[in-house]
């Protein structure tokens, strides 16, 4: 490639190759730093009470910008339902503990709103409080409906609801898996030249394993 780029001139090709290696090394260094920042941002959001899936999705939509990801999470509370191991529909059916309801009431929130928020956010006081503060002490309309649905008896059987949602759930899981794997693949146009067949096999195996693990977790629940 170096000789081709330099019309067969060996000396120029050697300089060209050395320069390209320096450029690629710099690009790889920047990509490592980018991945490190992304992991730090994910951990920062997890420390605020968000699940890893919610943090990753928000950061993906915000192109890695932490402040924008926080805005996305605040304005799209449905993302907070994303759980790392189980479908959110099962988790939202749990009744909140009285102790955590009392904590929110002590902060000044209405008991009914506190209970509804805790039901939606699986007893997570921090997320429930953030939602209530952001919406003037109440749940937004879409979350109010979700809280009511989770506390009432469904009119359809579990098998019926599972049948109608399984296809879209599988598609969402596969899309998320693809996005996760793609974010770990170097972005530079010539990086594939440094990849071996073993590297490609590892990436494919990781993708297939990721999809299989998510599907297995969904089936268990």
UniProtKB/Swiss-Prot annotation:
Query: Where is it chiefly localized?
Result: nucleus
Task: From the UniProt entry, list the residue stretches annotated as the region Disordered.
Answer: 136-193
Database matches in Pfam families: UBA
Q: Any one cellular component term from GO for this entry? A: nucleus
Renumbered to this chain, the Acidic residues biased-composition regions fall at 169-193
Would you say which domain of life the source belongs to? Eukaryota
| Keywords, sorted A to Z | Nucleus, Repeat
Tell me, what is an example of a GO biological process annotation in this record?
protein ubiquitination
SMART domains, sorted: UBA
Annotated ranges, domain UBA: 1-19, 30-76, 95-135
Instruction: Provide the protein's localization.
Output: Nucleus
Low complexity bias locations: 146-168
Q: What does this protein do?
A: Specific down-regulator of the NEDD8 conjugation system. Recruits NEDD8 and its conjugates to the proteasome for degradation.
Q: How does it assemble?
A: Directly interacts with NEDD8 and PSMD4/S5a, a member of the regulatory subunit of the 26S proteasome. Interacts with AIPL1.
Recorded protein name is NEDD8 ultimate buster 1
- In the record, what lineage is assigned to the organism producing the protein? Eukaryota, Metazoa, Chordata, Craniata, Vertebrata
Gene that this polypeptide is encoded by: NUB1
């Amino acid at each position: 490639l170096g000789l081709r780029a330099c019309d067969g001139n060996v000396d120029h090709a050697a300089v060209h190759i050395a320069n390209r290696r320096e450029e690629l090394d710099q690009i790889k260094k920047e990509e490592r730093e980018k991945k490190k920042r992304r992991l730090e941002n994910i951990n920062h959001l997890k420390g605020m009470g968000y699940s890893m899936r919610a943090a990753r999705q928000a950061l993906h939509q915000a192109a890695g910008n932490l402040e924008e990801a926080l805005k996305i999470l605040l304005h799209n509370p449905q993302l907070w339902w994303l759980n790392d191991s189980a479908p959110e529909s099962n988790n939202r059916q749990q009744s909140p503990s009285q102790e955590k309801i009392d904590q929110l009431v002590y902060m000044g929130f209405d008991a009914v709103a506190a209970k509804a928020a805790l039901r939606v956010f699986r007893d997570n006081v921090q997320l429930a409080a953030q939602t209530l503060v952001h919406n003037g002490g109440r749940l937004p309309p879409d979350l109010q409906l979700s809280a009511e649905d989770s506390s009432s008896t469904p009119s359809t059987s579990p098998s019926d609801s599972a049948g109608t949602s399984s296809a879209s759930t599988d598609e969402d899981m596969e899309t998320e898996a693809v996005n996760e794997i793609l974010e770990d693949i170097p972005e530079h146009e010539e990086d594939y030249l440094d990849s071996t067949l073993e590297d490609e096999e590892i990436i494919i195996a990781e993708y297939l394993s990721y999809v299989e693990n998510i599907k297995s977790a969904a089936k268990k629940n």
